[in-house]
């Protein structure tokens, strides 16, 4: 599907000095606006349909998760996922509960400290996780992406740059009201979402626990349609072998290595395996890997920045089953899902399982290793 972009306006101006909220240091205030994008279709809109396999009765009371395509209890169908901001500084390790997340985003959180990253983890059945985190602050990029899942952002404050985004009607969030765990670390590394926290917060707020009017109907990802079906990318254009991915994140050196036995890409950082003591020390792993080349804007000299998560026809990779293909990605607005297309302009089909999505600064893209 071919489209044309018209970039109408993008304003970034320094106005005055202001402080940050919560844990963040001071930074000069600026007024920002996400580029206004008009998308003009050259071809008629194509309706996206997903073929469903016949239910033989073995999945009674279950439905396919919109996040992973796995069979999960029907009672969760209308429940909104959470998007938890997880600190990825080395001091915050080990992470708890992240290996049980459905989708994990990793993205540059600041241009300072060699481009330190932060995780945004999406979880549908959050009550199954006893302890998730540690929780840290959010950024504007997260508040642009989370609405495409109709997810509730769980964080602890953030710089004032997030204020205009938090005020948008399709952004719901809980901030700084989670459990504190005595782990021997300084206070900023002790906040976790623990059993009962979400129910307590829903009980004292007007935030809807179930999908609201901003939820986009239809599939978010295009998944394989049958239990035993696997997309091995064998017929995809430009397919190449890929058993190793090295992200150009200098601070933590994120890496994914393909494990043929489990057919997953296992995640490491800081030169060590990422294991989860909250889940029997399981190593974080993914069936699907998506990598996005992203433009960004630098807000100030303190390293605050924002990715252009709303953009069109940007480069990327889809990686699964020991193979990789070049893709292009597009996102039209906050509540519309990001779409990924192969080089024949077909929307990609993901395999059933967890997905890792990395946003890589365009000026670091050449340092990405996919081999």
Predicted regions and their residues:
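Bacterial signal peptide processing site
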Residues: 21-23
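Repetitive helical segments and hydrophobic/amphipathic motifs
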Residues: 12-13
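A surface/extracellular/periplasmic glyco- and lipid-processing/surface-interacting theme
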Residues: 25-40, 44-105, 112-371
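C-terminal motif of bacterial Sec signal peptides marking the signal peptidase cleavage site
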Residues: 16-19
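Positively charged n-region of N-terminal signal peptides that target proteins for export
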Residues: 1-5
């Amino acid at each position: 599907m071919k489209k044309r972009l018209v970039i109408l306006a993008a304003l970034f101006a320094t106005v005055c000095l202001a402080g940050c909220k919560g844990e963040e240091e001071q930074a000069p205030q600026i007024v920002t606006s996400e580029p206004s994008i008009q998308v003009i279709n050259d071809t008629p809109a194509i309706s996206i349909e997903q073929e469903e396999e016949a239910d033989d009765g073995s999945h009674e009371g279950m439905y396919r998760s919109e996040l992973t395509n796995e069979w999960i209890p029907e009672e969760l169908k209308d429940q909104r996922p959470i998007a938890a901001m997880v600190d990825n500084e080395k001091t915050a390790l080990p992470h708890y509960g992240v290996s049980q997340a459905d989708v994990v985003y990793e993205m540059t959180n600041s241009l300072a400290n060699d481009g330190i990253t932060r995780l945004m983890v999406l979880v549908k059945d959050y009550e199954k996780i006893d302890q998730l985190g540690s929780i840290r602050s959010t950024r504007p990029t997260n508040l642009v992406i989370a609405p495409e899942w109709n997810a509730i952002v769980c964080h602890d404050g953030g710089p004032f740059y997030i204020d205009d985004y938090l005020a948008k009607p399709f952004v719901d969030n809980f901030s700084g009201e989670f459990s504190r765990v005595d782990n021997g670390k300084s206070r900023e590394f002790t906040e976790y979402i623990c059993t009962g926290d979400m129910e307590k917060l829903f009980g004292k707020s007007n935030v809807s626990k179930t999908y609201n009017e901003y939820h986009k109907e239809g599939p978010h990802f295009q998944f394989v349609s049958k239990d035993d079906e696997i997309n091995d990318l064998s017929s995809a254009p430009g397919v190449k072998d890929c058993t190793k991915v090295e992200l150009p994140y200098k601070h933590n050196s994120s890496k994914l290595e393909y494990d043929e036995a489990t057919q997953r890409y296992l995640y490491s950082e800081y030169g060590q395996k990422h294991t989860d003591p909250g889940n029997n020390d399981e190593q974080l792993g993914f069936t699907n890997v998506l990598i996005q080349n992203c433009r960004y804007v630098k807000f100030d000299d303190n390293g605050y920045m924002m990715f252009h998560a709303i953009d069109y026809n940007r480069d990327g990779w889809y990686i699964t089953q020991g193979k990789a293909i070049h893709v292009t990605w597009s996102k039209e607005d906050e509540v519309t899902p990001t779409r990924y297309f192969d080089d024949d302009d077909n929307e990609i089909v993901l395999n059933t399982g967890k997905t890792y999505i990395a946003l890589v600064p365009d000026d670091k893209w050449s340092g990405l290793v996919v081999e």
